UniProtKB/Swiss-Prot annotation:
Its main location: plastid. It is found in: Plastid, Chloroplast. Transmembrane segments: none annotated. GO terms for cellular component: chloroplast. It is an enzyme of class 1 (oxidoreductase). This is Glyceraldehyde-3-phosphate dehydrogenase A, chloroplastic. D-glyceraldehyde 3-phosphate binds at residues 208-210, 239, 254, 267-268, 290. It catalyses: D-glyceraldehyde 3-phosphate + phosphate + NADP(+) = (2R)-3-phospho-glyceroyl phosphate + NADPH + H(+).
């Protein structure tokens, strides 16, 4: 196991490019590539100790190099003194496609890093070589040979103990699922209940992007005003699980053309939001509407509260939390903005203060924006950092 010693590590260090060890890399064989990855892993974190730097980094593999997998890598790359070291990616599309889609992104723009393929089984990111493997069955992945500590499970497929457990069978020590987990898998939302993280758990979930938006400001509402019951609608950008044109899908609504329709679908956010408000356990409902935008979504929450209040007081509670315990997680916006303005927002949710309403004195309506890819991926990195900093 990696021996980690961490001091004074924050979760909001998103600025700047991550410094990576790098060595000259020419044409290599597969064995040479493994040696390079092993070499880089051994020297990262070496030398004199610095404040906020771990002595040994957690070896991380990304399973599924889609929207969240690539966003995660970009977010991690932008962190200073990360306790994580991404050394492997499992992607079925091949090295050329993986490197191209990492470098050029229709939503995020061009990645400010030198990205290129390395032979047929690696990509280089600013000189750091990451091995790329390809197998749809996690049991067959070389996690044991690579000494993988943590797998970022980003396929959306292996979300129960049996599926995610295949990574552990393959030799990984722990798994972090970037989707709602099924069954009894522990779910953690940074800023809400991540302080309760149990390092003895080998498999955990980072919940959904909508839960990560909703839970922080629901926590504030419940603590300040007492939530009785509520309902939530998320107007959500379409995702890769929908169809570009009408085509077969197990969900008949998602079978319809994503760019032409408003598509009602399902979400586990109502269940997961009980993490931040016991009052909402079994007394809340949620409806997602997928709309023809590629990124950024917005939550519309209406709750009945026990303490009489007014809009300015509600916004004041959000501002206080955003400046203190939820700094870097929650934000408040006073400008008349639209969805694209929240693209690449680092926070989990941004309350639109001008749209906060109180009906009577006990029914509160809150609108909050979130980048359902980038903001969520920042929280995946945060939770992975927590796993690293409490490694056992």
């Amino acid at each position: 196991n990696s021996s980690l010693q961490v001091s004074n590590k924050g979760f909001s260090e998103f600025s700047g490019l991550r410094t990576s060890s790098a060595i000259p890399f020419g044409r290599k064989t597969n064995d040479d590539l493994l040696s390079v990855v092993a070499f880089q892993t051994s020297v990262i974190g070496g030398g004199n100790s610095k404040r906020g730097v771990v002595e040994a980094k957690l070896k991380v593999a990304i399973n599924g190099f889609g929207r969240i997998g690539r966003n995660f890598l970009r977010c991690w790359h932008g962190r200073k003194d990360s306790p994580l070291d991404v050394i492997a990616i499992n992607d079925t599309g091949g090295v050329k496609q993986a490197s191209h889609l990492l470098k050029y992104d229709s939503t995020l723009g061009i990645f400010d890093a030198d990205v290129k393929p390395v032979g047929t089984d690696g990509i280089s990111v600013d000189g750091k070589v990451i091995q790329v493997v390809s197998d749809r069955n996690p049991v067959n992945l070389p996690w044991g040979d690579l000494g993988i500590d943590l797998v970022i499970e980003g396929t959306g497929v292996f979300v129960d103990r049996e599926g995610a457990g295949k990574h552990i069978q393959a030799g990984a020590k722990k798994v972090l699922i970037t989707a709602p987990g099924k069954g009894d898998i522990p779910t953690y939302v940074v800023g809400v209940n991540a302080d309760l993280y149990n390092p003895d758990e080998p498999i955990i979930s980072n919940a959904s992007c909508t839960t990560n938006c909703l839970a922080p400001f629901v926590k504030v509402l419940d603590q300040k005003f007492g939530i009785i019951k509520g309902t939530m609608t998320t107007t959500h950008s379409y995702t890769g699980d929908q169809r570009l044109l009408d085509a077969s899908h197990r969900d008949l609504r998602r079978a319809r053309a994503a760019a032409l329709n408003i598509v009602p679908t399902s979400t586990g956010a109502a269940k997961a939001v009980a993490l931040s408000s016991q009052a909402l356990r079994g007394s809340s409902m949620a409806l997602p509407l997928r709309v023809p935008t590629p990124n950024v979504s917005v939550v519309d929450l209406v709750v009945q509260v026990s303490k009489k209040t007014f809009a300015e007081e509600v916004n004041a509670a959000f501002r206080e939390a955003a400046d203190k315990e939820l700094k870097g997680i929650l934000d408040v916006c006073d400008e008349p903005l639209v969805s694209v303005d929240f693209r690449c927002s680092d926070v989990s949710s941004t309350v639109d203060a001008s749209l906060t309403m109180v009906m009577g004195d006990d029914m509160v309506k809150v609108i909050a924006w979130y980048d359902n890819e980038w903001g969520y991926s920042q929280r995946v990195v945060d939770l992975a950092d927590i796993v690293a900093n409490q490694w056992k």
